[in-house]
Amino acid sequence: MNTSYSQSNLRHNQILIWLCILSFFSVLNEMVLNVSLPDIANDFNKPPASTNWVNTAFMLTFSIGTAVYGKLSDQLGIKRLLLFGIIINCFGSVIGFVGHSFFSLLIMARFIQGAGAAAFPALVMVVVARYIPKENRGKAFGLIGSIVAMGEGVGPAIGGMIAHYIHWSYLLLIPMITIITVPFLMKLLKKEVRIKGHFDIKGIILMSVGIVFFMLFTTSYSISFLIVSVLSFLIFVKHIRKVTDPFVDPGLGKNIPFMIGVLCGGIIFGTVAGFVSMVPYMMKDVHQLSTAEIGSVIIFPGTMSVIIFGYIGGILVDRRGPLYVLNIGVTFLSVSFLTASFLLETTSWFMTIIIVFVLGGLSFTKTVISTIVSSSLKQQEAGAGMSLLNFTSFLSEGTGIAIVGGLLSIPLLDQRLLPMEVDQSTYLYSNLLLLFSGIIVISWLVTLNVYKHSQRDF
């Protein structure tokens, strides 16, 4: 009996190790290219509005894919979907590396990478729930969470070093390492029984078209893109009201406090993601830093601090409540953006401190936003509501990157508004930082109002 138990325990640990590897490289794939955006812009002679699509393309298919894989896990089985995700992710890596001299091929490769990498966060948690014993699941989730945080932390440093000393195109090959997990996971994971079910393909296509054309509008400001986006969303809303098992539960649309809360949370997440994508451009233009310095010295300390702030935020939520932590997080964000807008011309290390507080504030906000938003849900809405929140969180990051890329390409914003800014290279970034601060404060006030109303109603 002890032998059987030890073998089972060994199998569970092996599964967990390979899941950690997948989780690490999933996050790394998202983070490493961010610091190289200015280099890519220079290589292709493209404005930020176009270059930011290197990250936006990945986040778009990544966010949609997480929802799709989650819904398909019962119908097709985790084993098949994980294998499919790994192969697609590696296929995108090869296309991107081989065709890195062609911008259209690079963007296509990032779309493909995102579609493959989406399988990892969507299915890893399901694997833990199904294969890891109940008494060990908390530790397993905690370990995977720490690995993800570490991936987010070291991603910019690794990306900066490789891009500076070798070439940014080699960053596209990093996800290829996940191929080593295939034989082990195929052996360790059991063969699953496929469950028949309806899958709303039409709904996914309509929603995806609406999202893609909206993002194209935010970078090109072409009205035709906006019209196509609006029409797609209108048809999508009409469609999900008719089908029996829609991709998005239309009943959630009637819960106004929930929808407003999700929107405000998404705006906060998107604003920070847009800011992080702007940092490499800003540090190159204002302080003439190298890609390695931006990744290792400027961004790395902030991304690593997320681990500490996340732990502190969890303790504060238990002791002081979610609103207290939200207020601290928003204060960190808004004050950091405001301070940076006034003191952008100071030494480059000042931005390192700013990023620590920005990402710390984001960590606090993420810790509590799900608690605050879920308070407006009825019990029968909880599953669909939280799935929509997770989907929106991922999608908002891609949207924020696209919008900020578009704003960086608008000459009208490159005007002197603050009297203390002397260097012309700071005007655009200073104005956007001021805008970010205002957006955070407005979103915070609306979220507070939603939470207070939901507390009265439930």
UniProtKB/Swiss-Prot annotation:
GO biological process: proton transmembrane transport; response to antibiotic
Bilayer topology annotation: Multi-pass membrane protein
Keyword terms of this UniProt record: Antibiotic resistance, Antiport, Cell membrane, Hydrogen ion transport, Ion transport, Membrane, Plasmid, Transmembrane, Transmembrane helix, Transport
Subcellular location: Cell membrane
Record-annotated membrane-spanning stretches: 12-33, 81-100, 111-129, 140-162, 165-185, 201-221, 223-240, 256-276, 297-317, 324-344, 346-365, 432-451
CDD domains (alphabetical): MFS_MMR_MDR_like (cd17321)
GO CC terms of this entry: plasma membrane
InterPro entries named among the record's database cross-references: MFS, MFS_dom, MFS_trans_sf
Organism: Streptococcus pneumoniae
Gene from which this protein is expressed: tet
The name this protein goes by in its record: Tetracycline resistance protein
GO-annotated molecular function: antiporter activity
Annotated function: Resistance to tetracycline by an active tetracycline efflux. This is an energy-dependent process that decreases the accumulation of the antibiotic in whole cells. This protein functions as a metal-tetracycline/H(+) antiporter.
